[in-house]
């Protein structure tokens, strides 16, 4: 569909399909087709957001989860922003949203009516970003060269598991080989900063645990997973198992190499 892809996380990415000829150039139809392909090939549902700018696409992608999509056309942006809570804007956390609300700023429309100079004085660069987002402005391009910070792999299970041996088999036979393959594509030497595991339980709670580790290591991942299984599961069934690594910062890695 496009070569302009910016990964955000293990299962999320921005796509710029502005110049794509697929589906007669319709981003809505492309999103539908991609979601259907994911379901057909992986038996997994996916949500999508379609919008003229990145932050609105991100917001839209959360509106019809777990198996739907939401479209914001350019003409619909003003009406959509009018009632949009500021806390929905990526980068505006709970503390910032509470502070803004104490100033009488709850929605994008409230910010639209505010003085930019006041926002700059009170919040600095964040004030400008807030003002721009409230106007529907987001000049960031989809960056296909964005530095990857982590690599991971997960499996959602068709049935909950309750036996550690099943979890260990999934890690050793499925997840670890796939993680090693993915990591080798971006880091052939397998050097990393940290590695860890994730377990999601049948009550939708999850736990993660990781260690500082210089190189991908299967035995440590298995030991970490077993520790989390024994100490944090509490008898609950497990429906998702995941492994991940955090990559070394290139500048730090260069300093370490030079130090040697």
Regions found by a protein language model. Give the residues of each.
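DNA-contacting surface of Y-family translesion DNA polymerases
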Residues: 88, 101-240, 248-253
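Short, internal active-site loops enriched in acidic
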Residues: 19-21, 52-57, 200-204, 246-251
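Short acidic, low-complexity intrinsically disordered linear motifs used
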Residues: 253-260
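Nucleic-acid-contacting surfaces of polymerase cores and analogous helical-repeat interfaces
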Residues: 1-158
């Amino acid at each position: 569909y496009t070569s302009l892809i910016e990964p955000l996380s293990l299962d999320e990415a921005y796509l710029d399909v502005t110049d794509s000829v697929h589906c007669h150039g319709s981003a809505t139809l492309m999103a539908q087709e991609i979601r259907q392909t994911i379901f057909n090939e992986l038996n997994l549902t996916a949500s999508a957001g379609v919008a003229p700018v990145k932050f609105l696409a991100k917001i839209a992608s959360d509106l019809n989860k777990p198996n739907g999509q939401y479209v914001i056309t350019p003409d619909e942006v003003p009406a959509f922003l009018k009632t949009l809570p500021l806390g929905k804007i990526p980068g505006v956390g709970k503390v910032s949203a509470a502070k803004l609300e104490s100033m009488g700023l709850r929605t994008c429309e409230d910010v639209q009516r505010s003085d930019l100079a006041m926002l700059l004085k009170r919040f600095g660069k964040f004030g400008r970003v807030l003002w721009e987002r409230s106007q529907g402005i987001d000049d960031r391009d989809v960056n296909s060269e964005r530095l990857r910070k982590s690599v991971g792999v997960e499996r959602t299970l068709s049935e909950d598991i309750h036996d550690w041996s099943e979890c260990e088999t999934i890690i050793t036979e499925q997840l670890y080989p796939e993680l090693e393959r993915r990591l080798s594509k971006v880091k052939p030497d397998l050097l990393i900063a940290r590695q860890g595991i994730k377990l999601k339980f049948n009550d939708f709670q999850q736990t993660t645990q990781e260690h500082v580790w210089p190189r991908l290591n299967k035995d440590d991942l298995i030991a970490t997973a077993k520790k989390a299984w024994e100490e944090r599961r509490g008898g609950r069934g497990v429906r998702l198992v995941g492994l991940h690594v955090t990559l070394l910062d290139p500048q730090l890695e260069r300093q370490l190499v030079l130090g040697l």
